[in-house]
Amino acid sequence: VYGDITADKIPEIPELLTPDYVDHTFRRKNDENIIGIAYDTVAPVYTDHNKCNIITISGADNMGRTNFIKYFALQMLNSEIDTHIYIADDFRRKLSDIGQENVSYDLDPDEFIQKIIMIEVLLEEKYKRLIHQENPEKEITLIIINSQEVYTAISDSKDALNALKNIMGKYKVLNVYLLFGAVPNAQIAYGSPDIYKMMKETKSILFFDNLDNCKIVDIPLAIKRKNQKKIEPGDAY
């Protein structure tokens, strides 16, 4: 600062990206979420709900996958729009501390399957109100699945799988987000469970590991060569 002249603040990558940092540093619309900051531009990376409401999270252990899920959930809870979060966790209970208010937390796959079917019914009613030009509530529904057992249970249940397909597709316009965590870094082949095929088809994957180790999708060699720097915990492609 010199007299009335103020120098522009030099953008930087924070050591820890938090919802508070995002809210105080960047502007975002209600239909946008900041999922990180790009190293090359030091600019926020947005997801536009109208274009992409699903994020599949894969990669190595201890590289920040759980922290990202918590960050995303807290960003939603801190928004001005009412948010309801439904969590399916595994035996490690890594997401048990996300919050209590407006948060439903399950460890039992069978119980969560019933939740998925219930959510579809609620969204169907909301969708009908939208079609009849009523003003449905502008609340956000965030579904977080962080359990391979739950993925298997959903794939084995025709009702749950159809419900999830509708939630991911038909009811996308109703402020619905889905985070798929604990997704194995393994090739999704013809015989893989349907839910993994659905994830791959969205082409919206955050990979927390070096690209040379990526198996869940095929990475072109040119992109691998361009991104050879080893990543650190909290980094993702």
Write out the residue ranges for each language-model feature.
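P-loop NTPase catalytic phosphate-binding loop
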Residues: D23-K203, N210
